[in-house]
Amino acid sequence: MALNFQYPFQCIQFVERPQAKLLLASAGPRLYSYSAETGQRLASWPQDTSSSDQEPPEKKRKVSTAEGGSVEESETAEKTEKSKAPPAWSNIPIVTSTSNGEYVIAVTGEDKCIRVFQVQDDGSFQQLSERIMPKRPSSIALTSDETTILCADKFGDVHSLPLIPSNEKPAVAPRPNREAKLSHPAATNLTVHTKGNLRALEQQLELAKKKKEAGEEKSGPSFEHHLLLGHVSLLTDMLFVSLPSDTHKRTYILTADRDEHIRVSRGPPQAHVIENYCLGHTAFISKICVPRDAPEYLISGGGDNYLMVWNWTEGRALHKVPLVEDSSAAEVVVRGIWATTLGDLRLILVALDGSSQLQCFTLEADGSLKPQTPLDLTGNVLAVTSIEKDNTLLISVDSVRTAGSTNEWRASPSAPSILLEAFRLQQGTEGSLGWEPTLQSATGAINAVGTLEIAATTEDKKRGELNDLLYAMSKLRKTPRGGEDE
């Protein structure tokens, strides 16, 4: 039997529930949960309906035929056919959860849908809501009380919506379609008699119909949501940050866009108030990060070959940190910036698109980033999560493309595919950092069971589409003439 590739984990997140430690992940069009201790797969969503051994007995119903007789038709068979229909999305690019791991928020790709799940005690997902946004979400954040979702989209807007929607439909006063009323002709075919005027009337009626249909299409979502702020460029990342003050906590929304801007806005209900900007990048910004243990600092990166460290409350650049050698001509795309605290060290981890190295820095007291020995993985780094109590990193890697490339596929799949690797921090005597493999039993179990398969014989066109699902940020780069890379 020929081997096939496996969808890599696009997102991974460790959560600690009262009942168990879980690892949540997305790969292709599916969401997964695993035991972080054993690696056992607990659940997937949408559920795999290939096995019928747990299905209830078929129900029969009588259906009349054209000849006047009747035949029995299986309701289960009809439901099975519906369940076999492929999902309306091909990937789940954004996954986050509440701090206690009870609720998971996932964004499914093509349908622009924000889905909220409740994680059950057995690790299964119960979907509570699905809300289709006006534009495709590019980043999701939760407010400090974890009752509100903030959604940044590719149109440049940030909306807020409740984590758990109320059962009551929001009372939204309908807007009078004044334009349609004014544009509708007052004449009818009873008052117009000449052929020329009749043709003009038909054209006016057709135009009025199109305007009415366009007005209906432009109506916004029916669920509760509020527009908080907007950029003139598509948003690439967003953070919600809470800072303590003498009287109460001050909240902020930090947004980054394709046009090299980082904006600092006040939190709701004053999100329209702009505190300042952090300006200094010369290419698009793809990721911003505020360490939980050092919220006064902001680390940003994107299409430049360096990171920037900011005092973001003042809009002041503190440090510029190179990511590649000056002699390197390769274009850089920062895939992810993660902050974690392992032991007494505050670490900043950085992944670049198409790189099998995870760059590691320690965040010093003055905000500077001290380079450490990078971690070398078996494939391109896709996502990182940490188990801070165990000084451990879990890293998802791309086992489909050749390490170091975003478009060239490996000659053949491996068995099993390496989807996840784990390392434990080892601190040297003189402050140097080292890493040793760990959790090999758990990662081995996860890798062994795999995800959905990708045929090794996939055609080039389909391969290109799958590449774009993982490595599309490079298209944010502008050409020298000010256009976009297509």
Summary of predicted features, one role per range:
Residues 3-14, 30, 48-78, 165-221, ...:
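Terminal intrinsically disordered, low-complexity extensions flanking WD-repeat/beta-propeller proteins
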Residues 6-15, 81-97, 135-142, 229-245, ...:
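Canonical WD40 repeat/beta-propeller blade segments in eukaryotic WD-repeat proteins
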Residues 19-21, 100-103, 145-147, 243, ...:
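Short coil/turn segments that connect the beta-strands within blades of beta-propeller domains
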Residues 21-74, 107-124, 266:
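Beta-propeller domains
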Residues 27, 107-110, 152-155, 163, ...:
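Conserved strand-to-loop turn within each blade of WD40 beta-propeller repeats
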Residues 34-35, 114-118, 158-163, 262-267, ...:
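WD40-repeat beta-propellers
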Residues 44-46, 83-86, 129-132, 171-173, ...:
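Short C-terminal beta-strands that terminate individual repeats in beta-propeller domains
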Residues 270-367:
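WD40 beta-propeller repeat blades
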